[in-house]
A protein has these predicted regions:
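Mid-to-C-terminal Rossmann-like scaffold of FAD/NAD(P)H-dependent oxidoreductases
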Residues: 1-104, 139, 143-169, 175
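Generic alpha-helical structural context detector
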Residues: 16, 114-115, 128, 149
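A short, polar/charged loop-to-alpha-helix boundary motif
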Residues: 104-123
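Catalytic P-loop NTP-binding/switch module of NTPases
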Residues: 123-129
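Short hydrophobic beta-strand that contains or immediately precedes a catalytic carboxylate
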Residues: 176-181
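Short loop/helix-cap segments at secondary-structure boundaries that form the rim of catalytic
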Residues: 186-187
Length: 187
């Protein structure tokens, strides 16, 4: 976790306190980004490992969605895929964490989700975010909005996720796996 941001916020709070004002330090959410071989990896909030270490259980206490949107509209040249995982509380949809990786736009999306976590917002709130839009930068439905829609679908029972570790058992029990993606999305 990069400490420059938290250190500067603490310094400001200390200075405010010495000047007669002051607020309590709210701690850190844990937001970071780094460049790895031409890609940006970023995260904010809690990841699954931290939640499980705290005794929380997938499905019961938290769920997640993983989406693969483009960082801007696909008709504009250069649209790059982002892999975005959003973790949320099962009981009320409060956002707990997110991780993303991609060539472009990853830091922007993680920063927006970090702000949502800092305000204890829900996946439904993400759907309503009005984010800047222009074809070179985003889509009318930004990846942040799309993550909110996907998570809300899970909470409302409109979408039932199947984890990779569950797939083999489902296929063995007779389930059929059908890939409905168009050829240009299959890679």
């Amino acid at each position: 976790l990069p400490l420059a941001g938290p250190a500067n916020r603490q310094a400001r709070l200390a200075a405010d306190s010495m000047a007669g004002g002051g607020r309590a330090y709210r701690g850190v959410i844990g937001t970071a980004a780094l460049k790895v071989f031409g890609r940006t990896a970023a995260a904010t909030g809690q990841n699954e490992r931290a939640l499980q270490a705290a005794g929380l259980k997938y499905g019961e206490d938290y769920r997640f969605t993983v989406i693969f949107p483009r960082h801007h509209v696909t008709y504009y040249p250069g649209a790059q895929e982002i892999a975005l995982k959003l973790i949320f509380r099962t009981s009320d949809g409060v956002i707990l964490g997110a991780q993303a990786i991609g060539a472009e736009g990853v830091d922007k999306r993680i920063d927006v989700i970090a702000a949502a976590i800092g305000q204890s917002l829900t996946v439904a709130d993400l759907q309503e975010f009005e984010l800047s839009y222009a074809p070179p930068y985003s889509a009318a439905k930004d990846p942040v909005n799309m993550a909110g829609y996907a998570a809300e679908n899970i909470l409302q029972g409109r979408s039932v996720p199947l984890l990779p570790r569950e797939l083999a058992a489902e296929v063995a029990a007779g389930a059929m796996l059908i890939d409905v993606r168009p050829p240009e999305e299959y890679h």
